[in-house]
Amino acid sequence: MKYKDLRDFIQRLEALGELRRVTQPVSPVLEMTELCDRVLRAGGPALLFEAPPGYAFPVLGNLFGTPRRVALGMGVDAGDDAALDSLRDLGRLLSALKEPDPPRSLKDAGKLLSLAKAVWDMAPKTVSSPPCQEIVWEGADVDLHKLPIQTCWPGDAGPLVTWGLTVTRGPNKPRQNLGIYRQQLIGRNKLIMRWLAHRGGALDFREFALKNPGKPYPVAVVLGADPATTLGAVTPVPDSLSEYQFAGLLRGSRTELAKCLTPGVDTLQVPARAEIVLEGFIYPQDGTPAPAPAGAPPRPAGQAAAAYEHALEGPYGDHTGYYNEQEWFPVFTVERITMRRDAIYHSTYTGKPPDEPAILGVALNEVFVPLLQKQFAEITDFYLPPEGCSYRMAIVQMKKSYAGHAKRVMFGVWSFLRQFMYTKFIVVVDEDVNIRDWKEVIWAITTRVDPVRDTVMVDNTPIDYLDFASPVAGLGSKMGLDATNKWPGETNREWGRPIEMDAKVKARVDRLWQDIGL
C-alpha cells in the first residue's frame, strides 16, 4: 500500500484499527505527552487529537509508535514479524545502492541496469499550485503561537517543534538535505534550530557561511509530510541518493515537490502535499549580541557561522530520560507559513525509552543488518536494544574465524555509518547466542569475558552531545566487550564446552510432555 500524503496514511491506519480519534480536549502542554506515552508503552494506536483547547489545528501523535506502523509507512502492509523481514529487504536495496556488486554475467548486468533505472525513474518532479500552499500567512500574520506546538515535560524551556523535516542546501550542491532537528519556540516567528555539528543541515549552513559571509541562509521546515518522505529523512540513505528520490522508491511513485514562495528561499523545494511549511532564514547577527547569562556556556566564536544570530537552547527532556544542558544554536526566523486547508500538526515527544525514536530504532535496526553484512560478511545479526537510547549500545552476533576477529568487527561497526559514532558500547558474541535475549547476552558476558583481556577502551572519540556522562560535550570514550569463545592465542586455558542434551532424549521427552499433560 502506497500513500501519497499524510492524510492517505491516516485513512489507512484508521481502517486497520491503528489510529484512534480523540474528541475530548487534550492540551499540548504536558497532557498529550502523558497520553501518548501510556499508549505507546501499551503498543496502542496512533492518536489524532481533534480538539486541542485554544487551537484550530488537530494534532497527530504516536504515529510511528509500533514497528508495524513504521513498516506500513514504508509501504509494507503485514504483521510485525513479516514487516521486520520486509525492512531487511529494504536494507538489501540500500546496500545495493550504496555499494553495488560488480556484475558477473549479462544477467547480473541487466539487474544492475534495472536497479539504476528504477532509481532514476524516481527522480522527484515539481508541480504548480500545490496543496501545501492553499493557505499562506506572511508578514504580521506569521504567528507560530497559533500552532499547537507541544510542551512535552514539566522542566522544558518552552514549546518544541519535534517532527519538523528541515530542508537545506549547501553552496553549489544540487542535492537538498532533509534532517529532523528539534526547534524551540522563542517568539512569534522565531525558532532555535538545534542541529548538531556533524548533521547535514549544520554542515550545509557552515559551508554557506564560509562562502557567503553576511548573507541570510535559507531554510524550510516541513510539518506533516507523507510517511515515505518522513521515514526517508531518518534512514541511512547513500550520499549519492536524495531523500526525496528514496521516498519515491518506497512509495512506488515520484515525490511531488513545490518551490517555496519566499524570495531567497525559493531555491528550496518541499513536499507538495505537506500539511504545513515554514519558510525563512538564519540571519547574520544584527549588532553586538548580549553577553551570555551567568552560568551559561560561552557564545560560539571563531567560525563564520558564529556571526549569525544564536540563542541559548534548552533544557529539554530528551530520549535519554534526562533533561539536557543548555547550548547555543542558530535562530531560524520564519518569514512565511504555508499550509493545506484543515491542516494537521504532526508532533511527538522524546523521553526515557521506549519512546517513538526508540521504536523507529527497532525498525531501522532491521535496515542496518544487510548494510553491515554487505561490508562485514562475518556478521550474522545485529541489534540495537531500545533500552540503549537508540544507538548507544549495539550487540553483534558473528561467525568468528580467527583470534582477534571480534575486535576487528567492533572497530568496523564504529567506523561504518555516521549513526554509529554515537554507539558507546559494543558487545560481540558468537552465533550460538540470541542477541535479542538479554539473558543469553548476560550469560555470554559472564562466562566468556575476562575484563582485562576482552575489554577494548577507546578515548577521545565523537559522542552524542546529549551524553552528559562524557567528560566533554560531544567527545567521550567507547567500550567494546569481546564475549565470544576464545581461540588459541587469546587464551592458554582449555575452553569450556557448552552443555547440551542428547537429541534422542529431547525427542523422547517431547513425546512424554504431551502424555504427562504438561
From Swiss-Prot:
Cofactor annotation comment: Binds 1 prenylated FMN per subunit.
Residue sites binding prenylated FMN per the record: I180, Y181, R182, R194, W195, L196, R199, G200
Subcellular localization(s) per the UniProt record: Cell membrane
Cofactor annotation: prenylated FMN; Mn(2+)
Subunit structure: Homohexamer.
GO cellular component terms, A-Z: cytosol; plasma membrane
Family label: Belongs to the UbiD family.
Upper taxonomic lineage: Bacteria, Pseudomonadati, Pseudomonadota, Betaproteobacteria, Burkholderiales
Name of the protein described by the UniProt record: 3-octaprenyl-4-hydroxybenzoate carboxy-lyase
SUPFAM superfamilies in the record: FMN-binding split barrel, UbiD C-terminal domain-like
Record's bilayer topology term: Peripheral membrane protein
Keyword Thylakoid on entry: no
Function: Catalyzes the decarboxylation of 3-octaprenyl-4-hydroxy benzoate to 2-octaprenylphenol, an intermediate step in ubiquinone biosynthesis.
This enzyme's EC code(s): 4.1.1.98
Binding locations of Mn(2+): N177, E243
Enzymatic reactions: a 4-hydroxy-3-(all-trans-polyprenyl)benzoate + H(+) = a 2-(all-trans-polyprenyl)phenol + CO2
UniProt keywords, alphabetically: Cell membrane, Decarboxylase, Flavoprotein, FMN, Lyase, Manganese, Membrane, Metal-binding, Ubiquinone biosynthesis
Gene3D superfamilies: Single helix bin, UbiD C-terminal domain-like
HAMAP family named among the record's database cross-references: UbiD (MF_01636)
Main location: membrane
GO biological process, one term: ubiquinone biosynthetic process
Source domain of life: Bacteria
UniProt enzyme class: lyase
KW Transcription (keyword) present: no
Active-site residues (renumbered): D318 (proton donor)
Molecular function as annotated in GO: 3-octaprenyl-4-hydroxybenzoate carboxy-lyase activity; metal ion binding
The protein's annotated pathway: Cofactor biosynthesis; ubiquinone biosynthesis
